[in-house]
């Protein structure tokens, strides 16, 4: 049996949140990733003049670390920014929960 590839890109729902006085992007609750996990992505996603606080995005991300530092989700900055409607996010998270069972 092969070890699980933790560096593969996976679809993840993330959202803009206020964190320590700044706007940051973190995973939406209900997935395999902690909501405290940082997401490195395009700065445009945290620009509240474009996307209001609480906007949910669907990204292709991989779990990584930088030279043994803390883990974070990496999203290539050149990827298309996909905004999810709240209903679409609920469907995505519901499908994710069913797959995990």
Map each language-model feature to its residues.
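Structural detector for short beta-strands of small beta-barrel domains
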Residues: 1-19
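A structural detector for beta-sheet-dominated domains
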Residues: 15-17, 40-42, 76, 84
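Short acidic/glycine-enriched loop/turn segments that link adjacent beta-strands
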Residues: 19-22, 68
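Short, basic/aromatic beta-hairpin or loop at an interaction surface
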Residues: 21-38
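Short glycine-rich, polar/acidic loop-and-turn segments at beta strand-coil junctions
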Residues: 29, 43, 61-65
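Short nucleic-acid-contacting surface segments enriched for D/E, G, S/T with interspersed K/R
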Residues: 44-59
């Amino acid at each position: 049996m092969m070890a699980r590839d933790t560096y593969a890109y996976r679809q993840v729902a993330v959202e803009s949140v206020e964190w320590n006085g700044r706007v940051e992007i973190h995973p939406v609750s209900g997935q395999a990733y902690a909501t405290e996990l940082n997401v490195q992505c395009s700065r445009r996603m945290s620009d509240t003049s474009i996307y209001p606080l609480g906007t949910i995005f669907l990204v292709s991300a991989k779990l990584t670390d930088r030279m043994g530092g803390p883990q974070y989700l990496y999203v290539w900055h050149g990827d298309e920014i996909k905004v999810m409607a709240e209903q679409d996010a609920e469907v995505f998270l519901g499908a994710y929960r069913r797959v995990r069972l």
